[in-house]
Amino acid sequence: QLWHACGAFKKFGQRGTNMSIAADHAYHVQYNMVTVSSDRIRSIYADAFDIDVHKVKALGCPRTDAFYDEKLMDETKQKVYAAHPEFKDRYVIVYAPTFRDIGDDRTQFKPDLDFDKLSKDLLPNQIFVICPHPVMKNKIVEKSYDNIEVIRDFSTNDMMLVSDLLVTDYSSAIFEYALLRKPIAFYCYDLLNYNRGFYLNYPDDLPGDVYETQQ
């Protein structure tokens, strides 16, 4: 099994706090082998999947391979710029929120953001790019702005390459982004209500500042 996330940030698998989701993940126990990024998190994955730790191998995370391939990274950047020339020569802020277990419909993501204010507060050379989690299906931004966009035609990892700053919350995207040695900020407006649980000492272990309000 190749897991979609690198590292161990928020709790997942059968250790997720939403029991209906945890029940859906009972198939994890069928894995014969799981690959993870390092020895330090083998026990975490074994616990999350309810499998023997000997089935968890620290062989690396394949999705990070692209971040060590300069040619591939350059080609990806050029593809993004070809499709979105407005990103070139701009300070690109990528917002990559994770999905919420709270509520009946995880596909509807409504961040606590005043987009009118955000658009006014951005500097002339800045653009705010929202990269939704694949489970998020709603429009997110109802109005049209020349400095705020929602991107679905490229992956979050693709957008990382053309970004200057990552803004996230509880997403394991931080592990990939750390390889680029670019700044990370955490916008956690629902921290008090977010009860998924963490493997990290939150927020002390985070590689960036945490903000709970847009101000």
Language model regions located:
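Short, well-ordered beta-strand core segments
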Residues: 1, 34, 166-167, 184
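Active-site and donor-binding regions of nucleotide-sugar-utilizing enzymes
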Residues: 1-71
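Short active-site oxyanion
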Residues: 29-34, 127-128, 162-165, 208-212
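Catalytic binding pocket for nucleotide-activated donors in carbohydrate/polymer assembly enzymes
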Residues: 143, 172-215
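Donor nucleotide-activated moiety binding/catalytic core segment of transferases
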Residues: 134-175, 180
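Short, solvent-exposed loop/turn segments at secondary-structure junctions
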Residues: 5-8, 39-42, 62-65, 98-102, ...
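A short helix->loop->beta-strand "cap" motif at the edges of active sites that frequently abuts
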Residues: 31-32, 52-54, 124-126, 181-183
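Conserved catalytic-core segment of nucleotide-activated headgroup transferases in glycan assembly
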Residues: 62-142
